[in-house]
Amino acid sequence: MTFKNALRVVLWGVGAVLAVCVVGAILLINPGTPSSAKTLEFKGYILLPKGALLSVLDYLNVSEKRLFVTSETTGDVYKVALHDGSLPSDADVSVFASVPAAHGVVIDPQTGFAFVSRSEANTVDIFDPANMQPLKRIPVADDPDGIFYEPFHKLVYVVGCDAKLGTVIDPASRSIVATIPLGGKPEFAAFDSQTNLMYQNLKDTNTLVVVDLEKRAVTRSWKLDKCLGPSGMAIDEANRLLFIVCANNNMLVVFDINKERVQDGFPIGGGPDSVVFDAGLRRIYTTGKAGVLAVFQQDSPDAYHLIDSVKLHYGAHTLAVDFSTHSVYVGYASLVVRPRIAVFQPLP
């Protein structure tokens, strides 16, 4: 290849990268409105305070008419007061500000306190949602991400991705009581109240493991067929099923707990990260980095069909459902403009 040809290739590559960056920036600056949906009504946006030029929201959690939202970029945790029939206003939003890289947030129902994981500081912060003031900072294993409440033993379980560990925290004493080697990089987990066990995705080994918090150990593991890079997980306890989204091959798989195998798989939008199962409506919602909200109807434990695919906004990868109202909340990534949550209500 001549120098001119080599230079032309380099310039073309640089131009292509810049074009992608410009298009991406335009998408983040202009959230627009979601595409039309057959089964959902778009109610509007919950606008959050602008804390940085670029805002990437991570986990969402609905608890007692409050929506908690974390910001991976600023580290802020937002508390949004929810109202039936109307969108929250600016006055309904309060902020717990701290160091960057907030990820998971969970509420301990016994104390009412909130626990939030922070991957840059390698800590779990405890704060009081009543006044949004800090209570304690607990050092944990490297790269804490997902955080979950285990109601049977009344424990908080946080996973460290780089450390490949689960850390168990007693919320009453606000102290670590155990660390559990997981054998891979953990993502989402789901608690099974019938067995009092935690099911845990390992994204680097495409594995599902069972974590027994009483024994402080992994007790079972299975390879996940049809699933590369398992991320989000939701449980259907009544039918003994797990719904798992797979980030590296854009799939939703259904895992049968009793039969110990993947029973089905469905293609979904790019970079899927979150999945929620609304047992009341028998609907499965998934979102991913490509900004597509997929809605599946569970016709029976063995049969599913796609009932909606809604184009949202690039980076809209995280969601939550208020099971009392069936409202669906999706967090958007944003550049320059205020971060926001898209709100949907199922149509009758």
Give residue ranges: language-model regions.
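Short, Lys/Arg-rich N-terminal segment immediately upstream of the first membrane anchor
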Residues: M1-V10
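Predominantly soluble domains enriched in secretory-pathway, periplasmic, or organellar proteins
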Residues: N5-A6, V17, C21-P348
